[in-house]
Amino acid sequence: MNGEDQIQKAYESILGHDFEKAIEWFEKAIAAEPDNAAYHYKLSITFARSNKLFQAVEHASKALDLERDNEVYRYHLQVLHARELVDRAQKEISAKSEHGERAIFLLKEAIVLDPLAIEAYLILGEVFALRNDYSRAYQVVMDALRLEPNHELAKQQAARYQLKLKL
C-alpha cells in the first residue's frame, strides 16, 4: 500500500469520526514517504483537531522544514503557536500570577500570530476585567465582536464590561 492509499484510508477514518485510526493511517503514510510535507501537514491538522497540540506542532514544523516557502504550512504553524500561547496564558491565570502580566503578554502575542483567535481576545478581556481595567476589557472584546459579530460570549462580556464602565 502506498502513501496515497493510506491517506485515503485516513480520510475514510475521519469521515467515520475515528480520529485515532486516522492518525494511525497518516503515520503509516509518513512511514512510507517521510519527506512528503503534505502528509505531515495533514497529520498535524488531525492532531490539532484532537487537541494533541505538541504532536500537531511537531508535524507542522516538519512540513514547513520540507517546504520552506509554503505559506499555508507557515500560517498553520503560526496558528498552532498561537494556541500554545493561549494555553500557557490560561495556566498563568490559573496560577493567579500577580496582575496577569505574563498572561497579557502571551495573549497579545497569540493575537499577533493568529489575529482570528477569538478565544485569545475573550481571555484577554477577562484578564483586564480581573484587574478592574474595564475600558481595555471592553475594547478587546469589541475587537473580537468585529471579527465575529454573532459570538454570544463576546456579546455577554461586552455588555458586562460596558455596565461596569458606567458604575
Range-by-range predicted roles:
Residues 28-31, 62-65, 108-112, 143-146, ...:
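Conserved structural position within tetratricopeptide repeats
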Residues 2-4, 37-38, 71, 78, ...:
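Helix-start (N-cap) detector for alpha-helical repeat units in TPR-like alpha-solenoids
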Residues 16, 50, 95-97, 131, ...:
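Structural motif corresponding to the intra-repeat A-B loop/turn of tetratricopeptide repeats
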Residues 2-32, 84-109, 113:
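Alpha-helical segment of the N-proximal tetratricopeptide repeat
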